[in-house]
Swiss-Prot record:
This is Polyphosphate glucokinase. It catalyses: [phosphate](n) + D-glucose = [phosphate](n-1) + D-glucose 6-phosphate + H(+); D-glucose + ATP = D-glucose 6-phosphate + ADP + H(+). Pfam families: ROK. GO terms for molecular function: ATP binding; glucokinase activity; polyphosphate-glucose phosphotransferase activity. Residues 53-79 are annotated as: Disordered. The poly(P)- and ATP-dependent glucokinase reactions both follow an ordered Bi-Bi mechanism, with glucose being the second substrate to bind and glucose 6-phosphate being released last. The mechanism of poly(P) utilization is not strictly processive and is most likely nonprocessive, where there is dissociation of poly(P) prior to complete utilization. It comes from the Bacteria. InterPro entries: ATPase_NBD, ROK. Residues 62-74 have a biased composition (Polar residues). Belongs to the ROK (NagC/XylR) family. ATP binds at residues 83-88. Homodimer.
Amino acid sequence: MIRLRSAAARDRCQVLSLAYRITVAGRCQTVSPHHRQAKVSEQPSLAKEIAITSTDATADTPRTSPPSDTAGTTSRHRGFGIDIGGSSIKGGIVDLDIGQLIGDRIKLLTPQPATPLAVAKTIAEVVNAFGWTAPLGVTYPGVVTQGVVRTAANVDDSWIGTNARDIISAELNSQEVTILNDADAAGLAEGRYGAGKNNSGLIVLLTFGTGIGSAVIHNGKLIPNTEFGHLEVDGKEAEQRAASSVKDKYKWSYRTWAKQVTRVLVAIENAMCPDLFIAGGGISRKADRWIPLLENRTPMVAAALQNTAGIVGAAMASTADVTH
């Protein structure tokens, strides 16, 4: 039996049911297992050093030189993105023609406790270091509707009920801020520039980590605030079955864990008929060890953008209408 675990979750996803049934009816097809893996086209302050990190994940050594491109004016080809995480806050300028960072990104430690004002001040440090004065996008690790935070994960509970968009904008001299869920931002970026760029139709991104985040992209547009990690699958939430943290906790083999992931994917397929699943999170770097073991219908591929996806997706959201 598969159902949404709570009334709140049902309310958040109510709009999805109608959209899915209208747009994807009749498109499910069986995919043989050998086709499953498709080809993948210390506390910060202004007085302290700002760590400037390379976009190359293998060359993340902090440096103290200024960013190589600090243009503070917007154009239709550039945007600025901030990615709020539980341990760090990252930001940079994005070339929106190709979905890549221009120069380096800046990464600061997430303040503890991660209250709205403390995080907003840290975001301002990152933005001001680039001299960026145009609109920007910010990812948030939880549900956000119309700029207002509804849930909190990896940040302080005092976020809930606050207008995060206004709080961050106030620290940036009223710059225009677009705020969206972190998995949604990653889904936007992967759909346009990453693993889903050659696929139209319905794409579902799942990020496997402590929990399971999700994003749904339909014909290039985001259907925001899906919470597939909280789908109930045979008596348990999806993330209690298949988060990568569960694999680590029980020391499961990839084969054992893949069976749990399959159950979650089938549950999603029973509610909608995606054309492609994209796997994100650290475990996606070892996708060749577990994606071929999946037994659901829809092919899954590994995310391509990895650590830059949140920044890129946030920048996209700040410069265009990217949601249904």
